[in-house]
């Protein structure tokens, strides 16, 4: 009984103490400024400790788990040996214990990101060679799939003769032929007979060449030169006929310029084809040439005709005629001799704009030979009846137009020659040192004299006039002058 009374009194006292506790500190308020301030300070301290703790933990993880990498580049340098020969030495990294780690993890950490470093920055030459071989193989496969399936041999006929610009013209033609991706035979017909100069020049090409000599010498007039070049081309066709060369015959003059697409286009011809030729009427006097064109435009009140010679087609891509370069505006103003400065005009139909199948020239009769081609046995008789390539066919309308039916110009006709009496070294090869025309302190030939000839020095002195210095002339202008005893000053 006493125990239950004691417990009841204990719980009553405890409940009254809890109820009376707020009244003991009446100044306590949860919304006071001091409590808010301390709450904000507590939050800032928590946030700062969180940031510092994250950063500290990141650094600890970085130092514990990151590997130290040493990047050693092999630096090439030149070292002169005892024999005076430069040798290329390469520095190799030292064999250390960390080499194994370098091979496993070639990574340098900068900030938070890693940079991958190659052991050698330059590509492997063996891999580069394999890549080039793969590209060549791919190009060959593409040509076999999309290009000419069974290409024929290209037979090129070039008439030439020894002159000042022969090396200039033959260099361009030779390098164009060297780039042809098909089998090629180059027939060079030289006027005046075979010379060592021309033979040594065409031998540099490395092509299959047939060097023929022609007895007649090249004349000095353009009209006679066109006729002789026709005979030289027909002489080459006779060789094709006798040797039964199989392929596509094209006529490449030594001064013409050819596009590489031309050699792909002629592979499509079946028997006899024609293409457009750009005519570059050269003239040493540009003002005279422009005046001729203006006069033509003023008379006709139309634009001058395009300087192109080739086939003309209709909307159905069929040959209907020929576009010939109009030479009437240049009447009596064209060059007669080779070394004149007047414009040089082409012949009626240039041979360079035609290609033909070499089987048309064979003596043996072919079953599939077209009937519109003439009997070319006249090649054995003479050259009088043939003036242009169209003389080889009976019906010119059967000629196959090439180059998008003549709309694409794939070669250009140009005639540029030097004076007939101009001097030039044979083959443009200088065997002896040149004469010194301008003295220099250092000359490439120590044995030669560095002084000008006495006659040249006297002529230079006679032509030179004494120069008056600017300061002296200025003083003379500023000095006062006297007129009739009156002294006049230069300044007011």
Curated annotation (Swiss-Prot):
CDD domains from the UniProt entry: GlcAT-I (cd00218)
EC numbers: 2.4.2.-
Major localization class: Golgi
Sequence ranges of Basic and acidic residues compositional bias: 473-484
GO terms under biological process: cell wall organization; glucuronoxylan biosynthetic process
Tissue: Expressed in developing interfascicular fibers and xylem cells in stems and developing secondary xylem in roots.
Glycosylation sites: 99, 196, 314
Membrane topology of the entry: Single-pass type II membrane protein
A GO term for molecular function: galactosylgalactosylxylosylprotein 3-beta-glucuronosyltransferase activity
Keyword Cell wall biogenesis/degradation applies: yes
Region annotated Disordered, chain positions: 457-492
Name the record gives this protein: Probable beta-1,4-xylosyltransferase IRX14H
Natural source organism: Arabidopsis thaliana
Lineage per the UniProt record: Eukaryota, Viridiplantae, Streptophyta, Embryophyta, Tracheophyta
GN (gene name): IRX14H
């Amino acid at each position: 009984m006493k125990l239950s009374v004691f417990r009841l009194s204990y719980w009553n006292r405890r409940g009254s103490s809890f109820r009376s506790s707020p009244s003991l500190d009446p100044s306590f308020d949860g919304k006071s400024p001091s409590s808010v301030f301390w709450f904000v300070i507590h939050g800032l301290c928590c946030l700062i400790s969180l940031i510092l703790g994250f950063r500290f933990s990141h650094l600890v993880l970085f130092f514990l788990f990151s590997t130290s990498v040493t990047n050693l580049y092999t630096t090439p340098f030149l070292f002169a040996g005892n024999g005076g020969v430069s040798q290329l030495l390469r520095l190799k990294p030292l064999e250390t214990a960390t080499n194994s780690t370098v091979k496993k993890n070639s990574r340098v950490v900068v900030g938070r990101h890693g940079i991958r470093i190659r052991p050698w920055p330059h590509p492997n030459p063996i891999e580069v060679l394999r890549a080039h071989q793969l590209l060549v193989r791919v190009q060959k496969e593409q040509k076999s799939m999309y290009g000419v399936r069974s290409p024929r041999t290209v037979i090129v006929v070039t008439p030439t003769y020894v002159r000042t610009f022969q090396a200039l013209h033959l260099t361009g033609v030779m390098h164009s032929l060297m780039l042809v991706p098909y089998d090629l035979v180059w027939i060079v017909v030289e006027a005046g007979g075979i010379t060592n100069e021309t033979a040594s020049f065409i031998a540099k090409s490395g092509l299959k060449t047939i060097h023929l000599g022609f007895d007649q010498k090249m004349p000095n007039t353009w009209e006679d030169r066109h006729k002789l070049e026709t005979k030289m081309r027909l002489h080459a066709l006779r060789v094709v006929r006798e040797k039964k060369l199989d392929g596509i015959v094209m006529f490449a003059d030594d001064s013409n310029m050819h596009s590489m697409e031309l050699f792909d286009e002629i592979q499509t011809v079946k028997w006899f084809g024609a293409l457009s030729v750009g005519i570059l009427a050269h003239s040493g006097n540009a003002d005279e040439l422009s005046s001729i064109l203006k006069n033509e435009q003023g008379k006709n009140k139309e634009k001058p005709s395009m300087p192109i010679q080739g086939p003309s087609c209709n909307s159905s891509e069929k040959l209907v005629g020929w576009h010939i370069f109009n030479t009437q505006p240049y009447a009596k103003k064209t060059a007669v001799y080779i070394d004149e400065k007047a414009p040089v005009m082409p012949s009626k139909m240039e041979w360079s704009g035609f290609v033909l199948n070499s089987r048309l020239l064979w003596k043996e009769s072919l079953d599939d030979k077209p009937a519109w081609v003439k009997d070319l046995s006249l090649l054995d008789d003479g050259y009088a009846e043939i003036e242009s390539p169209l003389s080889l066919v009976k019906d010119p309308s059967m000629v196959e137009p090439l180059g998008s039916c003549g709309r694409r110009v794939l070669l250009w006709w140009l005639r540029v020659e030097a004076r007939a009496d101009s001097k030039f070294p044979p083959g443009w090869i200088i065997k002896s040192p040149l004469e010194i025309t301008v003295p220099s302190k250092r000359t490439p030939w120590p044995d030669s004299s560095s002084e000008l000839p006495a006659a040249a020095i006297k002529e230079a002195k006679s032509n030179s006039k004494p120069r008056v210095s600017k300061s002296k002339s200025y003083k003379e202008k500023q000095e006062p002058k006297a007129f009739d005893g009156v002294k006049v000053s230069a300044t007011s």
